[in-house]
Amino acid sequence: MKPISKTLKNGMRAIAVPTNGAASMTIMVFVRVGSRYETKDINGASHFIEHLMFKGTKRRPDTLNISKELDRYGAEYNAFTSKDMTAYYIKMDAAQTGLAVDLLHDMLFHSKYDPKEIERERNVILEEINMYEDNPRMHIEDLIEESLFPDSTLGWNIAGPREVIRTVPREKLIAYRDAYY
């Protein structure tokens, strides 16, 4: 199986790996954005944006609409953020590839960034930070990276510091998204 690669108008590169005869398919979009590309005033923005992508679009107004559409087909879907990338994926029946592509496109380019959802997600992310700090393995990894890269964004926490998560304005999140997506 030879990968097929195409560069889109916005500069993103799409790569497909055909799998003949498979009953399911996975579409995963990797965006070259993570905590290493952030500045101190928006540290955590990549991860914050990842959360907001699932909170509603112009055509799918809220989380429930997105999940109902995917759950109807037994889809598995999620996202993750690292130091140098953010990825979004959907795995589902291969016959529904068009839906998966349409939904990911809608989430990536037409998410609403509803102010109420942003406020709700602040608390979700703050709880996630608490969870990381309560997990010795995860917390030690963060402390090691902080020590190894003290003067670099590579030493920063992917989720960001609590103060930034509490206060980063919607406009800064949208500007950051517009710069990288």
Task: Report each predicted region and the residues it spans.
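N- or domain-start disorder-to-order transition segments that initiate the globular core
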Residues: 1-24
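A glycine- and charged-residue-rich anion-binding loop/surface
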Residues: 4, 16, 35, 53, ...
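Charge-rich, well-structured scaffold segments of protease-associated domains
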Residues: 7, 18, 65-181
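A broad, low-specificity signal for short, low-complexity segments enriched in glycine/proline
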Residues: 12-14, 37-40, 48-53, 107, ...
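M16/MPP (pitrilysin/insulinase) zinc-metallopeptidase core fold and M16-derived inactive scaffolds
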Residues: 21, 26-91
